Swiss-Prot record:
Main location: membrane
Protein name stated in the entry: Uncharacterized protein AF_0864
Membrane topology type: Multi-pass membrane protein
Transmembrane portions of the chain: 13-35, 50-72, 77-96, 101-115
Disulphides: none
């Protein structure tokens, strides 16, 4: 098997870090769902439901990002596809939020460019 490119290692670590932040957001959302009824948040209609669903969303997203990190780390083709899809969605989102999305366009464009380089695709077998 080919040696993992350094950039792929960096991306896998970044995906793990992002997953950690998603799990932290899930924990905060879960906490807010619990205390919403006993604080001023309870005055907001459906606050508990919103925070509960936010926590579920963040948990699922964090799990998917961890799975993607594993796929990148191990050189799995599906990990490459997930990273390309998430990067493309992020790029589209940044394009839709111009002009503030310029930094995202540059960073995500560079990541997408890197993921499509021959040596990276060969590592993933795609």
């Amino acid at each position: 098997m080919l040696e993992r490119p350094t950039g792929v290692t960096v991306l896998a670590i970044l995906y793990v870090l992002a997953a950690v932040f998603f799990f932290l957001a899930a924990a905060v959302s879960g906490y807010l769902a619990q205390v919403a009824s006993t604080t001023q948040l309870g005055e907001i209609p459906y606050a508990e439901l919103f925070f509960a669903f936010s926590g579920i969303f963040f948990s699922i997203t964090g799990t998917v990002w961890l799975i993607t990190a594993y796929g990148l780390w191990k050189g799995r083709g599906w990990g490459w596809w997930l990273a390309v899809i998430f990067t493309a969605f992020g790029l589209i989102s940044s394009l839709l939020s111009l002009p503030k999305g310029v930094v995202g366009i540059v960073v995500l464009g560079a990541i997408l460019y890197y993921l499509t380089r021959r040596h990276v695709r060969e590592f993933f077998g795609v």
